[in-house]
Amino acid sequence: MTSELSDSSPPGVLFKVHPSVQDFLLSPPAYKTRHFAQGQSHHDNPNFLATGAIVFDRPLHSVRTSALKTPPRILLVQRAPHDSMPLLWETPGGGCDDDDPTILHSCARELKEEAGLDAISVGPLVRCPAASAETATEESRGKGEFELAEAIGCHSFFTRRGKLVFKFYFILEVKQPANVLVDPNEHVAYLWATEDEVRHKRIESEGGKEGVELNFTTEEQRSVLLEAFKQWNNYIVE
């Protein structure tokens, strides 16, 4: 994993862009046309694109400049009780809008809307482990959409209405201090979780605070968080 960022942002982009995600500097419709045009592939094409914002509690570039006295933590938000998948935990994120300038803007916009944080850099991509194919229904196996998602590193899933979604996860650095402000219409709480806490799906009680069970929206959500920690740890030892 590299921390290098482009020296200058493309026109109209207010955040730094990691070199590995230049391909996502396309509007959602343009990205779908380039990669999933009808007749270009035998795979089922996604109906919608979505993004997830993975935010650590410290800038990546600070890892090598100071001793890590505490393990890194990732931001999680808890879904509102009146929404689908009530009270489950996830990263900030959501669907790409067709009028978003680029997919990276979609991710930064969702982070701002759901957590009140301003992105200052976007990328790298966190490739989703091959979990979608494992959890696919028997009716969906072999049709190609899960194999395609695995190949391009995203999480694929079907909505309750049967629409196929491809979701990309990016590591984002944010303007400091990171004062999280959730939208109560979508989320009711937030917390910062370590790798061990994500792995064991629990934050133990400490200092009089009750422990928290980390019940995630999907197993893929948890898997991609562990992959993000893996990228972080690989960067430390490079």
Briefly describe each language-model feature range.
Residues T2-S6, G162-K163, K167-E238:
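Nudix hydrolase/Nudix homology domain
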Residues T65-E114, V126-S132:
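Conserved Nudix-box catalytic region and its N-terminal flanking loop in Nudix hydrolases
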Residues G116-A178:
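Active-site segment of metal-dependent pyrophosphate-handling enzymes
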Residues V55-D57, Q78, E173-V174:
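Residue-level signal for short segments within beta-strands and strand-turn junctions
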Residues P59-P71, P124-L148, E197, G207-E210:
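Intrinsically disordered, low-complexity domain-flanking/linker segments in eukaryotic proteins
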Residues T2-S66:
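Acidic, metal-coordinating catalytic segment for phosphate/diphosphate chemistry
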Residues K16, H43-F48, K69, D83-S84, ...:
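A generic fold-level signal
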Residues G52, R73, A189:
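Conserved beta-strand and immediately adjacent loop positions that scaffold enzyme active sites
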